[in-house]
């Protein structure tokens, strides 16, 4: 990891003239506690200023109510909910509002809202900012910082493949986000995938949709059938799983972003040549990529942006493949050996053999990516057709 910097004191600026605030002695104490917590984080000057700005804006928001939002557009759907870009009228802030429809008893609903309050304490440059959660008309609303670049699955659709040097920066942010959640809050993400990694025109990369509310996870499991394709083999088998499961999901996501399609079943030599524009050899010198000892299934992955024209693989075939077949890997000779090895360590089927967060943070691929000069914001804005720079909260419509 980067050398430790001296913690920079956090100053929350007072709210502007005419803004109503509810800052009493209790919330003053909360701000002091927040300053102490942020002081413990390894923030550079820019990260500190951005967190300060977000928290200053958040202090002006007050209690969130359904009637205070004007819809702007729909950002996407997934994880049992629809996400809208909205304007919060009292503060004029642009936010992302996720609506989750749940048929649940009031006691369960109140427990979910209570459990979501933990998100107020999740303040990190690698975690999407949280404004608050509330219940209205049969729906739970989770209001978050708006990330104007969208999610990495949306970026992938535009880019077709994401370059290794960009994925180096993504890997650093995801790892630091997972380390923060584990060390500061003792929680694991549980749902790492490209659609839960968000980016913005300032070049920030942040995790969202992690499992802070056990009750919400349970309620959604009863209501929705989500994609299970990023789950680790041990989790699919119903055995005990830990943060090592998040490591698997990150590795699988990186392969998808690097080759341009969900990597199960693996692309054959013909598809790899179509993807990379040249023959791709395996380590033995022969064309091809599949490590599977048995015949490759006839279906293609459930989702992806590749050139595979076979009928879709049924979800049960996909889950069987993840549990019983060799793990995906990066095609040899297209990427650096550091990146190949990093992904391989993430995708060991036995969680005991899989690299942990600390090992991955010290890996050569990450160490190289930390010192590499990469204009992530420039690449992102060019790919997504965004002006640069702009702020995620007051972004242009």
UniProtKB/Swiss-Prot annotation:
Looking at the UniProt record for this protein, which Gene Ontology cellular component terms does it annotate, in alphabetical order? Answer: early endosome; focal adhesion; late endosome; mitochondrion
Q: Name one GO molecular function term.
A: protein tyrosine kinase activity
> What gene name is given for the protein in this entry?
map2k2
Reading the lineage from the top rank, the first entry is Eukaryota
Active site, renumbered: 191 (proton acceptor)
Q: Which residues bind ATP?
A: 75-83, 98
Provide a GO biological process annotation: regulation of stress-activated MAPK cascade
Q: Which CDD domains match?
A: PKc_MEK2
For this protein, what is the EC number?
2.7.12.2
- This chain's protein is named Dual specificity mitogen-activated protein kinase kinase 2
The protein's matches in PROSITE patterns, at most eight in alphabetical order, are given as:
PROTEIN_KINASE_ATP (PS00107), PROTEIN_KINASE_DOM (PS50011), PROTEIN_KINASE_ST (PS00108)
């Amino acid at each position: 990891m980067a050398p430790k910097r001296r913690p920079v004191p956090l100053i929350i600026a007072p709210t502007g003239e005419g803004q109503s605030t509810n800052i009493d002695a209790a919330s003053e104490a909360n701000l002091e506690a927040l300053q102490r917590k942020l002081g413990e984080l390894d923030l550079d000057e820019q990260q500190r200023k951005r967190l300060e700005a977000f928290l200053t804006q958040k202090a002006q928001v007050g209690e969130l109510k359904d009637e205070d939002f004007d819809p702007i557009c729909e950002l996407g759907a997934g994880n049992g909910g629809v996400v809208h870009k909205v304007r919060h009228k009292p503060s004029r802030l642009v936010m992302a509002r996720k609506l989750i429809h749940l048929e649940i008893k009031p006691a369960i609903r109140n427990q979910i809202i209570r459990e979501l309050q933990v998100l107020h304490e999740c303040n990190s440059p690698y975690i999407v900012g949280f404004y608050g959660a509330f219940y209205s008309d049969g729906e739970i609303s989770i209001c978050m910082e708006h990330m104007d670049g969208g999610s990495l699955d949306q970026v992938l659709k535009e880019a077709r493949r994401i370059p290794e040097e960009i994925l180096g920066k993504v890997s650093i942010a995801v790892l630091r986000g997972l380390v923060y959640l584990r060390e500061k809050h003792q929680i694991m993400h549980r749902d790492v995938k490209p659609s839960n990694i968000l980016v913005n025109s300032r070049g920030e990369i942040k995790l969202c949709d992690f499992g802070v509310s056990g009750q919400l996870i349970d309620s959604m499991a009863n209501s929705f059938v989500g994609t299970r394709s990023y789950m680790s083999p041990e989790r699919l088998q119903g055995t005990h799983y830990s943060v090592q499961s998040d490591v698997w999901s990150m590795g699988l996501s990186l392969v998808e972003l690097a080759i341009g399609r969900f990597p199960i079943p693996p692309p054959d030599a013909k598809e790899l040549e179509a993807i990379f524009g040249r023959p791709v050899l395996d380590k033995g010198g022969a064309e091809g990529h599949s490590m599977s000892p048995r015949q490759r299934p006839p279906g293609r992955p459930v989702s992806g942006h590749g050139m595979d024209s076979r009928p879709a693989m049924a979800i049960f075939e996909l889950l069987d493949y993840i549990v019983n077949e060799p793990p995906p890997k990066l095609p040899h000779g297209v990427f650096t050996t550091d990146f190949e090895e990093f992904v391989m360590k993430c995708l060991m089927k036995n969680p005991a053999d899989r690299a942990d967060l600390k090992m991955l943070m010290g890996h050569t691929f990450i160490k190289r990516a930390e010192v590499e000069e990469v204009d992530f914001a420039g690449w992102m804005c060019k790919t997504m057709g965004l002006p640069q720079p702009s702020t995620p909260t007051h972004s242009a419509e």
